[in-house]
Amino acid sequence: MARAASGRLAGRTILITGASQGLGRAVALACAREGANLLLVARRAGPLEEARAEAESLGARAIAVAADVGDASEVERVAAAALDAFERVDVLVNNASELGPTPMPYLIDTDPDALRRVLEVNLHGPFLLTRALLGPMLAAGSGSVVNVSSDAGVVGYPGWGAYGVSKAASDQMTRIWASELEDTGVRVNSVDPGDMATAMHAAALPEDDPAELARPEDRTAVFVYLASAESAGVTGRRFEAAAFPVPGAEPAHAQ
């Protein structure tokens, strides 16, 4: 199917990691409805292909690349595939996340290899992918990088050690990227999507009733905003998706 000819993201190319399910898939479909080209990345090829097909059914041009963003060589392959297919990426959404072992152990009981794996996916991968795609953004004088955050990176919840440390570091990396890229036209922000009915939330907090949690598709408005021209000049900020009012509106709350 031909891609959508109009929309707030028409003509923009967006790369989304962790796009096979949950928030990543919901953001991909929201961007597809707004006319974006998509490059979708996730580890599992089957669900990723389903997400790609669904995006194309909405009129988007969508390409799927099965890869593990916690592996530096695979990050290089993703970046090469993106630049080969689209020449440049306008928007990067670093959404892929690794929770770590469950039930979630206290730091004193955390295996060092498990901590390393969480940091590779949640911090090292986004750093490498951002760096790999930054050149064409700088040459064009525009671009948007969105890192998915969590309140576990702000509050010291017991048992959330590996994940919380990775998200705290990700927020700081967002601020530093934004400062270093000031006045280049490339903006870097983070979004805390809040509690949602996702597989990751179920793994972390199996006692929670998913019917009482937000759906991922209800938390996509801020991502479309940050991917669009409406957010030009907005950088170095931390948004709470639950507080973002309507598509295209100014955020109700940002930090």
Model segments located where?
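C-terminal helical subdomain
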Residues: 183-184, 190-193, 198, 207-253
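The beta1-alpha1 cofactor-binding region of Rossmann-like NAD(H)/NADP(H)-dependent oxidoreductases
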Residues: 46, 66-78, 112
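Residue(s) in the substrate-gating loop at a strand-loop-helix junction
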Residues: 150
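Substrate-binding pocket helix/loop in short-chain dehydrogenase/reductase
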Residues: 103-107, 111-116
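Alpha-helical segment proximal to the catalytic Tyr-Lys
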Residues: 135, 178-180
